[in-house]
Amino acid sequence: MPKPTSTLPFLSLLLMLSYFNLGGNLKVANGQKTWCVVNPLTRHAELLANLDYACNHVGCSQIQQGGSCFYPNTYIHHASFAMNLYYQYMGRHEVDCNFTNSGLISLSDPSSGSCTYESDGDIEGNGTSENEISETWCVVKPTTEDYMLQENINFSCNHVDCSPIKDGGSCFQPTTLMNHAAFAMNLYYQSTGRGSTSCDFRGTGLIVTRDPGYGNCTF
């Protein structure tokens, strides 16, 4: 007897298309998970402030030594993890991921390896069954290792003009691989039509709903 054809791939495609409307506005259907991550351009002092604030409200044992999310032992990962816990705990309102404009709501799961970023559902409080988002950006996953960041920069800058992240450019500061990779990846994402696959980067890209640009640095 022939085996029945699975409908899972087709259903997965339909779900993906409902989340990512290529060539138009992105629509977030109720039930789609969201996460809060830190803007890659965030300064060290702000990362510490966000980490302290979030961990004063939620348990951050997972990012302490020996915890499942201690590695990579970076402030940007630890701050993102704590900020997301706070965002989920407070009910996933947009304001719960503000953190003095240093938080970004992600439509992509920041989890990596054994470290799971919690998500209980979509953005609350909009009063509609579907939240339409007119613009999206691509940033880098907080757990991405340096060699992958550099590979993402190299790949993107082979396709787009990365002069803003070169010495003297408007996005050179802060001079971190995380910032430079996010800028280059987003430029590639925008130039290729903002398709979900254009922000994959071997699982290291995140699609976010707020402009990561800061000061004179425009994403």
What would you call each of these model-derived segments?
Residues 1-10:
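Bacterial N-terminal signal peptides that target proteins for export
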Residues 2-3, 15, 21-219:
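Folded extracytoplasmic luminal domains of secretory or organellar precursors
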Residues 10-16:
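Acidic/proline-rich low-complexity IDRs
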